[in-house]
Swiss-Prot record:
Domain of life of the organism encoding this protein: Bacteria
Subunit-level organization: Tetramer of two alpha and two beta chains.
Free-text function comment from the UniProt entry: The alpha subunit is responsible for the aldol cleavage of indoleglycerol phosphate to indole and glyceraldehyde 3-phosphate.
Native source species: Pseudomonas putida (strain W619)
Alphabetical list of InterPro entries matching this protein: Aldolase_TIM (IPR013785), RibuloseP-bd_barrel (IPR011060), Trp_synthase_alpha_AS (IPR018204), Trp_synthase_suA (IPR002028)
Entry keywords, A to Z: Amino-acid biosynthesis, Aromatic amino acid biosynthesis, Lyase, Tryptophan biosynthesis
Protein name stated in the entry: Tryptophan synthase alpha chain
SUPFAM superfamilies cross-referenced by the UniProt entry: Ribulose-phoshate binding barrel
Length: 269
């Protein structure tokens, strides 16, 4: 059983949803970013998505684009992101880490080398936003062969004809993007999310995590009553943008994570 399967199975047994947190690797700098990464599990993160900075983050909203820019300006690259996971794994073997981003940096790094190093570093899954199932052979197939889950994004515009193709080779969990568009955009209604989850469940047994537009503990709790996982990214990244220095960035991200975790954990009581 993979770390992701195990985590979702444990939480299902506990009768609660997972808090899935997204931060960009290297934002606001390597050391502070590593501190955030190491602090997230104790602050209540059940799964961590770590963004791989790329110069053209087309699916991301302003908050994550700016985070990417800060990270790149601080010298972050894919090798350093993998090193960050290695350093995280020294103290934490339990929390799943999913790398999220675009195919270009992986292609430049070399797919075979990337898959081998990601596996060795302790990466559990990949979300590659610009690689549709038609390109499985390029990365999804070798990643899954190495035991790394390949997590698919589905959206309100993924129709019933397309959905089975998208979900066919998915593993780990399904990431439902509750608002069509870029990250951090407005939030979806619970009615819409309820319908979307019911539709996805007709096509897959994988856990379903819902993200995009979730910013507060109250919103997180509302989604936690419906989905297997609640993904929060832009709200955490905004804390880094607003902080006066790296120490405040670390403290504020972890503080918001704790509040979100409280919302998620209390949702089904």
């Amino acid at each position: 059983m993979s770390r992701l399967e195990q985590r979702f199975a444990e939480l299902k047994a506990e009768g609660r949803s997972a808090l899935v947190t997204f931060v960009t690797a290297g934002d606001p700098g390597y050391d502070a970013s590593l501190q955030i990464l190491k602090g997230l599990p104790a602050a209540g993160a059940d799964v961590i998505e770590l963004g791989m900075p790329f110069t053209d983050p087309m699916a991301d909203g302003v908050a994550i684009q700016l985070a990417t820019l800060r990270a790149l300006e601080a010298g972050q690259n894919l090798a350093k992101t993998l090193q960050m996971v290695r350093e995280f794994r020294v103290d934490n073997q339990a929390t799943p880490i999913v790398l999220m981003g675009y195919y270009n940096p992986i292609h430049r790094f070399g797919v075979e080398k990337f898959v081998a190093e990601a596996k060795e570093a302790g990466v559990d899954g990949l979300i590659i936003v610009d690689l549709p199932p038609e390109h499985d052979a390029e990365l999804a197939t070798p990643a899954q062969a190495a035991g790394i889950d390949f997590i698919r994004l589905t959206t309100p515009t993924t129709d019933d004809a397309r959905l089975p193709r998208v979900l066919e080779r998915s593993s780990g969990f399904v990431y439902y993007v509750s608002v069509a568009g870029v990250t951090g955009a407005g939030s979806a209604t619970t009615e819409h999310v309820t319908e979307a989850i019911a539709r996805l469940r007709r096509h897959t047994d994988l856990p379903i995590s819902v993200g995009f537009g979730i910013r507060t503990p109250e919103q997180a709790a509302a989604i936690a009553r419906l989905a297997d996982g609640v993904v929060v990214g832009s709200a955490l990244v905004d804390k880094i943008a607003q902080a006066k220095d790296a120490d405040q960035a670390v403290a504020d991200v972890l503080s918001l994570c704790s509040a979100l975790a409280e919302g998620v954990r209390g949702a089904r009581r």
